[in-house]
Amino acid sequence: MTDWLDEIEPGAPDAVAAFRGIEAGKFISVRREVRRRAGPGSAERVVAQLGAIAQALVAIVEALPEPAFAAPGGEGDWNVAEAIGHDADSRAGLAMAGALAATGKFPPEAPSVVPGIPGTRGLGREALVRRLGASQRIVERAGRSIAGHEEEPCPLEHPQVGRLRCGEWLLFAAVHDLMHLEQLHGIAEALRSEPGGGQPGASRRDGAEPGGSEPGGSEMGAREALRGEHGGGEPA
């Protein structure tokens, strides 16, 4: 059992419960947990859990040495800064999609989710911390709109995940956060174990983007199918 996941579980129990299905390579159990835990009255609770995860993301961003942000980020050919920026954009975009659907404002012409959009290249520590903070503020506003509408359908379409309900997208954003938090902990561990200029992230990769050919068996397939990447294609 992963130490970092155990540490965050008290503050984000629903997200961690769903994420553990990914660890076990059980895609169906992840969908089941998301559905079970994102029902009526869940939005406020899930927003708080997204806040706890955002704090954990900020903590690891603040702990990484500056050169790490240009190192391989464990996601295709992205660097660490791009992966973090992508996650910040994704959590905000998924929450916003649920809020738009909950309030009847989801634009009919909105594009589907576009997987594999990296964050802005070249951002440093302070900019990434600000980006994560801004994403959490969007999540909190979206959560207030989703509250009471958790079980309403959302037109957002993901090529691997399909469609989820408004409250389910909010929880899925937290699960997606944990995927990238896992990568960051792997990168931090690589830095600790390879003093003097190792390549953090090169030894801890979750595989190719959805549709890629990176090997990895059933667990890898679950990880790929569950990547709720939502950059560039989010409704506005």
Describe each region flagged by the PLM.
Residues M1-R35, A70-V113, E151-G196, A236:
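Short, contiguous alpha-helical
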